[in-house]
């Protein structure tokens, strides 16, 4: 069994109104991770993802750049114990 990890990610900068959520969901699905992404009221984007260590790490690295129209100023990552309760990667509203 692959080494599974879970991360809570908060991205700040110009990350709303630039297709960040859709792009993150597409990237998460491409990488085969489970989880979700949503906008926060304060202008940041939050995601919670779980999967193989390499895939989750790749998504965290992707968040540092985001889609072309985004300007990422910061990425906060909190590593938590995997729970196995996340479904297919989705956008939450």
Curated annotation (Swiss-Prot):
The keyword Hydrolase applies. GO terms for molecular function: acylphosphatase activity. PROSITE patterns: ACYLPHOSPHATASE_1 (PS00150), ACYLPHOSPHATASE_2 (PS00151), ACYLPHOSPHATASE_3 (PS51160). The keyword Hydrolase applies. Keywords: Hydrolase. It is an enzyme of class 3 (hydrolase). InterPro entries: Acylphosphatase, Acylphosphatase-like_dom, Acylphosphatase-like_dom_sf, Acylphosphatase_CS. It comes from the Bacteria. Its EC number is 3.6.1.7. It holds the Pfam family Acylphosphatase. The active site is at 21, 39. Residues 6-93 form the Acylphosphatase-like domain. Gene3D superfamilies: 3.30.70.100. It catalyses: an acyl phosphate + H2O = a carboxylate + phosphate + H(+). Belongs to the acylphosphatase family. PANTHER family: ACYLPHOSPHATASE. This is Acylphosphatase. It comes from Anaeromyxobacter dehalogenans (strain 2CP-C). The gene is acyP.
């Amino acid at each position: 069994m692959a080494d599974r990890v879970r991360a809570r990610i908060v991205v700040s900068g110009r990350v709303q109104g630039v297709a960040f959520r859709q792009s993150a969901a597409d990237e998460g699905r491409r990488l085969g991770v489970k989880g979700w992404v949503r906008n926060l009221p304060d202008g940041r984007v939050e995601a919670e993802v779980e999967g193989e260590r390499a895939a989750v790490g790749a998504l965290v690295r992707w968040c540092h750049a985001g889609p072309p129209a985004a300007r990422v100023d910061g990425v906060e990552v909190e590593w938590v114990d995997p729970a196995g309760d996340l479904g297919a990667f989705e956008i939450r509203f």
